Swiss-Prot record:
Record keywords, A-Z: Pyrimidine biosynthesis, Transferase
Name of the protein: Aspartate carbamoyltransferase catalytic subunit
Biological-process GO terms, alphabetical: 'de novo' pyrimidine nucleobase biosynthetic process; 'de novo' UMP biosynthetic process; amino acid metabolic process
GO cellular component: cytosol
Annotated organism of origin: Corynebacterium kroppenstedtii (strain DSM 44385 / JCM 11950 / CIP 105744 / CCUG 35717)
Gene it is expressed from: pyrB
HAMAP family reported in the protein's UniProt record: Asp_carb_tr
Gene3D superfamilies (UniProt xref): Aspartate/ornithine carbamoyltransferase
Catalytic activity of the protein: carbamoyl phosphate + L-aspartate = N-carbamoyl-L-aspartate + phosphate + H(+)
Binding site for carbamoyl phosphate: 55-56, 105, 138, 141, 266-267
E.C. designation(s): 2.1.3.2
Cytoplasm is among the record's keywords: no
């Protein structure tokens, strides 16, 4: 595997392999006072973000540094992008500098795929990792969600996962639907009709407009943020009505199975899609998702830059 651009790039076996690798990294670092492995020493990773990020960017940076890579952050607001430099020229510049991997977040769907074409036309350039491209894909988020589900539920096959909220603008919803169904889960989208994408009926999911009817037998409820920055208005009458119909309240939490969990990719809008107290409830796995993100991204970087043949990631510092 050269790049990670979409969940379509991965088979069920490859997904399971990455999740196993992430779990191995987690266990290798557990209890260490110094969280440092020599796995990527001498490698150079650039994060190139054209959109704001807290979790994804810091998680990738931490993942690279915990494997001893040199991680350099490029922000559109403080680079030559501000002067009008194209994505193509930015990518080629960083490739010429010596990048081993480029991690890109971009508002345009397909940007990561295009970047990979520019920097590695013959497969000999840096690996490209899609950290979110418009409403298209966010593969590492889906992987960390799957790892969290596996840890909390004991497995994914046969589980019912309900994804609630702004499906229309959510790359997380798309990536999770692809990954989870490959691993044998039932995925249900719950949203108002105005927040469902055109053609969603062809996706490997079931559509529901009634959140309450899906709670009792769900193994996990994944709440999504309403992405107001991608809306011009008119998608729902008011925040209050949205919270009433599609928010995770204490009353709705009480209807869930004892071992069912609540997830959220972040950032959370407390008081809108999730109640303040529910956000901090024991069944809510948000911080576990964040923690797993580091280990999943370690596994992805290791797999793309080094490969999984003949090298241990747990080699001790000499």
């Amino acid at each position: 595997m050269k790049h990670l651009l979409s969940m379509a790039d991965l088979s069920a076996d490859e997904i399971t392999g990455l999740l196993d690798e992430a779990q191995n990294f987690k266990e290798a670092l557990e209890g260490r006072e110094l969280k440092k492995l020599p796995t990527l020493r001498g490698r150079t990773i650039f994060t190139v973000f054209y959109e704001n990020s807290t979790r994804t960017r810091s998680s990738f940076e931490t993942a690279g540094k915990w494997m001893s890579a040199d991680v350099i952050n490029i922000s559109a607001s403080s680079s030559s992008v501000k002067k009008g430099e194209s994505l193509q020229d930015t990518g080629l510049t960083l490739t010429a500098i010596g990048a081993d991997a480029l991690i890109i977040r971009h508002p345009s769907s397909g940007a990561a795929q295009q970047l990979a074409h520019w920097v590695a036309p013959n497969g000999d350039g840096p690996s490209v990792i899609n950290a979110g491209d418009g409403a298209h894909q966010h593969p590492t988020q889906a992987l960390l969600d799957a790892l969290t589900l596996r840890q909390r539920l004991g497995g994914i096959n046969g589980r019912k996962i309900v994804i609630v909220g702004d499906i229309l603008h959510s790359r997380v919803a798309r990536s999770n639907a692809e990954l989870l169904t490959k691993l044998g889960a039932e995925v249900v989208y719950v949203a108002p009709p105005t927040l469902l994408p055109y053609g969603v009926e062809t996706w490997p999911v079931r559509i529901s407009y009634d959140m309450d009817s899906e709670l009792a037998d769900a193994d996990a409820i994944m709440m999504l943020r309403v992405q107001a920055e991608r809306m011009a208005g008119g998608f729902f009458p008011s925040h209050r009505e949205y919270a009433t119909l599609y928010g995770m309240s204490t009353a709705r939490e009480a209807k869930m199975k004892d071992k069912a969990i609540i997830m959220h990719p972040g950032p959370m809008l407390r008081g809108m899609e999730i109640n303040y107290s529910v956000a901090d409830a024991p069944r809510t796995a948000v911080l576990q998702q964040v923690n797993n993100g580091v280990h999943v991204r370690m596994a992805v970087l290791f797999s793309l830059i080094i490969g999984t043949h003949g090298q241990s990631h747990t080699t001790k510092e000499s």
